């Protein structure tokens, strides 16, 4: 079980990423534009650096919805591999069954 503070930190990062998404995209567009002047591009780089670190989507971590486990999370279910297996064995995930060959 993950600490509550770690779960809360990830929730905070998601909210910050949503808040600054438009501004971040706009600045990155200016930076990657080869027709923009070097001065404008440099200003965009500096502005991008002033944004909060946690507003970057790459700082987010996929966590299990039940336990908060950060590793072995299956995106399709939002659960860790352990919880997916437990739920599948109980028949709680429709269409998912144990492989047999």
Curated annotation (Swiss-Prot):
Biological processes, Gene Ontology terms: translation
Keyword rRNA-binding set for record: yes
Presence of keyword Cell membrane: no
Highest taxon of the lineage: Bacteria
Pfam families: Ribosomal_S14 (PF00253)
Coiled coil regions in record: none
This protein's GO CC annotations: cytoplasm; small ribosomal subunit
InterPro entries assigned: Ribosomal_uS14, Ribosomal_uS14_bac/plastid, Ribosomal_uS14_CS
Molecular function per GO: rRNA binding; structural constituent of ribosome
Keywords linked to the UniProt accession: Ribonucleoprotein, Ribosomal protein, RNA-binding, rRNA-binding
NCBIfam families xref list: PRK08881.1
Entry's family note: Belongs to the universal ribosomal protein uS14 family.
Role played: Binds 16S rRNA, required for the assembly of 30S particles and may also be responsible for determining the conformation of the 16S rRNA at the A site.
Subunit structure of this chain's protein: Part of the 30S ribosomal subunit. Contacts proteins S3 and S10.
Protein name as catalogued: Small ribosomal subunit protein uS14
UniProt organism field: Haemophilus influenzae (strain ATCC 51907 / DSM 11121 / KW20 / Rd)
């Amino acid at each position: 079980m993950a600490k509550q503070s770690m779960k809360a930190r990830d929730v905070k990062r998601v909210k910050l990423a949503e808040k600054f998404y438009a501004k971040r995209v706009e600045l990155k567009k200016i930076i990657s534009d080869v027709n923009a002047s070097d001065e404008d591009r440099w200003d965009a780089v500096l502005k991008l650096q002033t944004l909060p670190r946690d507003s970057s989507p790459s700082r987010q971590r996929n966590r299990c919805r039940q336990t908060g486990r950060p590793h072995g999370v299956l995106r399709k279910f939002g659960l860790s591999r352990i919880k997916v297996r437990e739920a599948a064995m109980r028949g709680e995930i429709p269409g998912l069954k144990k492989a047999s060959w």
